[in-house]
């Protein structure tokens, strides 16, 4: 899981990706965040959270850093939002080094990402 998250962060950094948008579809209990020049026709980067149990985030994330929850964060989130056994808490740190810092999260079974052009 950490390798996938590192891959996402490295790809975003190396390709100048600063913002991702959540697709307005929720299919197969999955959510997708995408990035591309013209999202109405195509996108070239996709992060998919699979078998989502709970989501707490905005539709658009600027300068997100995706990571696993710390043990303390995991315990606090599960206490407040549900245990969801077998699922992982993924954290999105947004605007981390600014006064606008926010922390969002998704509780899901897995995640994956693609770096290929997809036409809508």
What are these regions (language model features)?
Residues 1-120:
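Surface-exposed, interaction-prone regions used to assemble/regulate multi-protein complexes
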């Amino acid at each position: 899981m950490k390798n996938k998250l590192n891959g996402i962060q490295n790809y975003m950094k190396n390709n100048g990706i600063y913002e991702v948008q959540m697709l307005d579809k929720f299919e197969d209990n999955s959510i997708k965040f995408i990035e591309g020049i013209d999202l109405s026709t195509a996108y070239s980067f996709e992060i998919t959270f699979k078998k989502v149990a709970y989501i707490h985030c905005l539709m658009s994330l600027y300068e997100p850093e995706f990571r696993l929850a710390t043990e303390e964060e995991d315990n606090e989130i599960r206490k407040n939002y549900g245990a969801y056994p077998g699922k992982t808490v993924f954290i999105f740190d947004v605007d981390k080094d600014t006064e606008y810092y926010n922390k969002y999260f998704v509780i899901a079974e897995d995640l994956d990402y693609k770096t290929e052009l997809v036409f809508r």
